[in-house]
């Protein structure tokens, strides 16, 4: 019974967090691409295009509802860190411009039936950052996590911006962490992301083969396992192709 209550609460929280995005999408409202490192998080999250794009701008349990002032008043620089704030702001503005031009940003990785079977799959999604080289290779970016704190913006968006400037198309992965990472859930999410992107390569204007994975910290550990030739944990276990390039930033080992 307790497990069911926990899962029900998780589903309710996920639903509440997506309500603003659905409202923005329904209204067709568009926000300005005017984010700077010193923009408060509350202003970023209330930007109609950020909401409509569907990017996850929280850090899991770091945004406890009992500490509302923290995530409202904190600037982007304070929220991510000084090293990545500039690129993160540029990446958010690029995302806003893409969304305003009609590009879909967020893609769910599992079907409604699959999510109903395993509710935590609701959180798994990718964020699309198209590059300037149509038909080029793509990069899957996997941020780290501190068990209960994710890094979609700090490491994901900032890295996507850097790679976009080089012409590469990027996908930032949001995967299951913490107590939702049981039964190799993160590996399942990585493999599903690769499968989804390669199956929709024409739609995304990317090559389906020889893709790259760039991952940080514990995300690097996950990526390393996925890229291995392990029959139980590697890409072969999930029936997807091996990355053509693997770049790991301070991976956990």
Language-model-detected regions and their locations in the chain:
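Bacterial N-terminal signal peptides
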Residues: 9-18
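Short beta-strand element of the alpha/beta-hydrolase
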Residues: 136-145
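Short beta-to-alpha linker loops that shape the active-site pocket of alpha/beta-hydrolase fold enzymes
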Residues: 145, 169, 174-178, 252
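Catalytic nucleophile-loop/oxyanion-hole region of alpha/beta-hydrolase
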Residues: 151-155, 173-208
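Short amphipathic alpha-helix adjacent to the substrate-entry channel of hydrolases
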Residues: 153-171
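Primarily recognizes the serine-hydrolase "nucleophile elbow" in alpha/beta-hydrolase
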Residues: 192-253
């Amino acid at each position: 019974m307790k497990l069911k209550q926990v899962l029900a609460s998780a589903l309710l929280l996920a639903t509440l967090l997506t309500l603003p995005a659905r409202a923005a999408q329904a209204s067709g409202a568009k926000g300005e691409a005017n984010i700077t490192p010193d923009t408060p998080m509350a202003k970023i999250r209330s930007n109609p295009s950020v909401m409509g794009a569907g990017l996850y701008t929280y850090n899991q349990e770091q945004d406890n509802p009992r500490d509302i002032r923290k995530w409202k008043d904190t600037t982007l620089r304070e929220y991510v860190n000084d090293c990545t704030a500039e690129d993160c702001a540029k990446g958010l503005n690029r995302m806003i411009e893409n969304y305003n031009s009609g590009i879909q940003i967020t893609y769910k990785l599992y079907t409604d039936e699959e999510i109903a079977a395993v509710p935590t799959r609701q959180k798994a999604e990718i964020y699309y950052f198209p590059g300037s080289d149509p038909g080029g290779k793509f990069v899957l970016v996997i941020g780290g996590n501190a068990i209960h704190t994710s890094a979609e913006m700090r490491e994901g968006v900032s890295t996507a911006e850097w790679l976009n400037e080089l012409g590469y198309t990027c996908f930032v992965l949001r995967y299951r962490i913490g107590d939702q990472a049981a039964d190799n859930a993160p590996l399942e999410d990585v493999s599903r992301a690769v499968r989804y992107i390669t199956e929709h390569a024409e739609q995304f204007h990317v090559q389906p083969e020889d893709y790259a994975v760039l991952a940080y910290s514990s995300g690097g550990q996950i990526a390393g396992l996925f890229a291995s030739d392990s029959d139980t944990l590697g890409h072969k276990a999930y029936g997807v192709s091996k990355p053509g390039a693997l770049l790991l930033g301070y991976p956990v080992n």
